[in-house]
Amino acid sequence: MRKTVVAFAAAIAACSAVLSSTTTSAAPPATPITTLQADGTHLVDGYGRTVLLHGVNNVDKDAPYLPAGETLTPQDIDILVRHGFNTVRLGTSFDALMPQRGQIDEAYLDRLTGVVDALTARGMHVLLDNHQDGLSKAWGGNGFPEWAIESRPREWEPNPGFPLYYLMPSLNAGWDEVWGNTHGALDHLGTALGALAERVEGKPGVMGIELLNEPWPGSRFLSCFPNGCPDFDRTYQAAMQKLTDAVRAQNPTIPVYWEPNVTWNQMMPSNLFAPPVTPALTTADVVFAPHDYCIPSQLAIYLGLPQALRGLCVPQQDLTWSNIDAITERANVPTVITEFGDGDPTVLKNTLARADERFIGWQYWHFGAGNATDPFLGEVGRQLVRTYPQATAGEPGRMIFDADNGDFAYRFTPRAATRPTEIFVSDLHYPDGYAVQVDGGQVTSAPGARIVTVVADGSGPVTVKINRPGSAGAEVPDGPIETSSSGSSGSS
């Protein structure tokens, strides 16, 4: 059955703008938020729907952590909700959780859960990111409390700052302490993350805990080049399992997010979950959480190298995504890209197209607190703010979105769910409204709604197309969801 709805948006968009600026921040989401659990390579909500996450990072790296007046404001959250973002990767850290050996900072947990509650009240799924860069303040970094690491910079060592401080012998010695648990750093970190997990138990909007941001291999880093480091990854996987066990001892059902070691960002493959090199994954609700950065872009941003090198980003990111595909295939786990972009709009398409092809969610780096103006009104926002299925009452198929004109097409196969499919319609791409066409189902939302709801007519495939009035629209790509980078030019 074909249903067509045309939204006459001149009036509707104006009304929406007024409503978005006057509605109180306490307004609840239309569909109450539920926990997310892993189901094969997808995340599924409490209504039985497959969830796709589009969101941002918000990470406070420096003490005092999350002080009053410096957290996400109601206006910040309004911006995120208005643009259809449904997740925030919210930074926490070992140093914030346990500033003194063995002592959890309960006041900090109060502040952190206050931010969590403000986000989840608006329908945002929150990933708690145990963040670090450069290990500890001793090296000008952040993350681990200074009491947890005995190594210190030596007088003769120059400190080149991020990211080159990872080459400092003393910093590598500090990481060796972590992986060897020489002075109990992993034990104490497990206690801290366990306290965090216990505090957020029963909060359905918490989608999980990311155990450690961008873990560095320490003095074994050279062994990771040029083809990955199975010996270190064996040590690393054991450490992640240790932290997972500590978290699950306090909150048995909370999902945990594992990153690969950070040489992944330098194109090295991960050996996680790769028998016989490393153990097969047997723990439930583990989500793979890689980052997708373009090295030339990062070198231009942080070291001032020529921006023309960004032309190398496409083949580099193809390799990164082939490494993601390898993990997905062997471990059968969901993937969420928990960092990418770093303010560089020239590389956003590379990540977003590949994520769309694979029905993989993402969290953009970075969205700060206290925004006086909307940061998504430029080219970065035009890529990130997308029409997409936030929740699918069925098995997702192929999807495509054209960021230039807003043409969107999506196909899914229905299955039992207690709520309908929900598709967010970008508020940036349809200045004169949008048209919806559905084959195999029907629209149940009001004309011009920001969330289009769709129910299937039967058990056959459902195809949804959304575009500007008069546009020829997009066609759903043939075949199943991509599992390789061979078709990575589809969406933009």
Swiss-Prot record:
The keyword Disulfide bond applies. It is found in: Secreted; Membrane. PROSITE patterns: PROKAR_LIPOPROTEIN. Changing residue 62 to A: Decreases enzyme activity. Disulfide bonds join 224-229, 294-313. Keywords: Disulfide bond, Glycosidase, Hydrolase, Lipid metabolism, Lipoprotein, Membrane, Palmitate, Secreted, Signal, Sphingolipid metabolism. One of its GO terms (cellular component) is membrane. The keyword Coiled coil does not apply. Pfam families: Cellulase, Glyco_hydro_5_C. A lipid is attached at residue 15 (N-palmitoyl cysteine). Changing residue 339 to S: Abolishes enzyme activity. Changing residue 342 to A/E/F/K/L/W/Y: Abolishes enzyme activity. One of its GO terms (biological process) is galactosylceramide catabolic process. It is a lipid-anchor. It catalyses: an oligoglycosyl-(1->4)-beta-D-glucosyl-(1<->1)-ceramide + H2O = an oligoglycosyl-(1->4)-D-glucose + an N-acyl-sphingoid base; a ganglioside GM3 + H2O = N-acetyl-alpha-neuraminosyl-(2->3)-beta-D-galactosyl-(1->4)-D-glucose + an N-acyl-sphingoid base; a ganglioside GM1 + H2O = beta-D-Gal-(1->3)-beta-D-GalNAc-(1->4)-[alpha-Neu5Ac-(2->3)]-beta-D-Gal-(1->4)-D-Glc + an N-acyl-sphingoid base; a ganglioside Fuc-GM1 + H2O = alpha-Fuc-(1->2)-beta-Gal-(1->3)-beta-GalNAc-(1->4)-[alpha-Neu5Ac-(2->3)]-beta-Gal-(1->4)-Glc + an N-acyl-sphingoid base. This is Endoglycoceramidase I.
